UniProtKB/Swiss-Prot annotation:
Gene: Dctpp1
GO terms for biological process, alphabetical: dCTP catabolic process; DNA protection; nucleoside triphosphate catabolic process
The EC number(s) this enzyme carries: 3.6.1.12
Stated name of the protein: dCTP pyrophosphatase 1
Role of this protein: Hydrolyzes deoxynucleoside triphosphates (dNTPs) to the corresponding nucleoside monophosphates. Has a strong preference for dCTP and its analogs including 5-iodo-dCTP and 5-methyl-dCTP for which it may even have a higher efficiency. May protect DNA or RNA against the incorporation of these genotoxic nucleotide analogs through their catabolism.
Length: 170
């Protein structure tokens, strides 16, 4: 059985993000602002009739495909998107925006409060991926070695928002 951070699951081949420096999003627009902007855009064009969950999901998948095309056939040895040419960076920005717009629209149509859902999901991830078992490991939680500590002891009593960047996603 592998130890956390070594073994079969590996470390995910993380890029050196320190070279790019720290990044943070601008505080605006909020997800609610994005939801409202898109709802107004669709209403002005009488497109709400087409925005059923299935259609929004398929549009989202299509946009994710367009985003994936930007990365297709690029080698892992090539510099990351931070070093792309301006035209490629602009396309990346547009496709990521399309993905976010459709994700927010789908969540709104399904009445899912994304910020609350993210906090809940990160709490679940924190329980599934205790730091002492998952640090440096790309293993799925079902494949992590189990130590002698219970999940409650391993998770600790820290603030749920404090470790958002330290957990693997599922």
């Amino acid at each position: 059985m592998s130890q956390a951070g070594t073994g079969v699951c590996g470390n995910g081949g993380q890029e050196d993000s320190a070279a790019a420096g720290p990044f943070s999003f601008s505080p605006e627009p909020t997800l609610e602002d994005i939801r409202r902007l898109h709802a107004e855009f669709a209403a002005e064009r009488d497109w709400e009739q087409f925005h059923q969950p299935r259609n929004l999901l398929l549009a989202l998948v299509g946009e994710v495909g367009e985003l994936a095309e930007l990365f297709q056939w690029k080698s892992d040895a090539e510099p990351g998107p931070q070093a792309w040419q301006p035209k490629e960076r602009a396309a990346l920005q547009e496709e990521l925006s399309d993905v976010l717009i459709y994700l927010v629209a789908l969540a709104a149509r399904c009445h899912v409060d994304l910020p609350r859902a993210v906090i809940s999901k990160m709490d679940t991830n924190r329980q599934r991926y205790p730091v002492h078992l998952s640090r440096g490991s790309a293993c799925k939680y079902t494949d992590l070695p189990r130590g002698t500590l219970s999940e409650n002891e391993a998770v600790g009593s820290g603030d749920p928002a404090s470790e958002l960047g330290n957990q693997a996603s599922t």
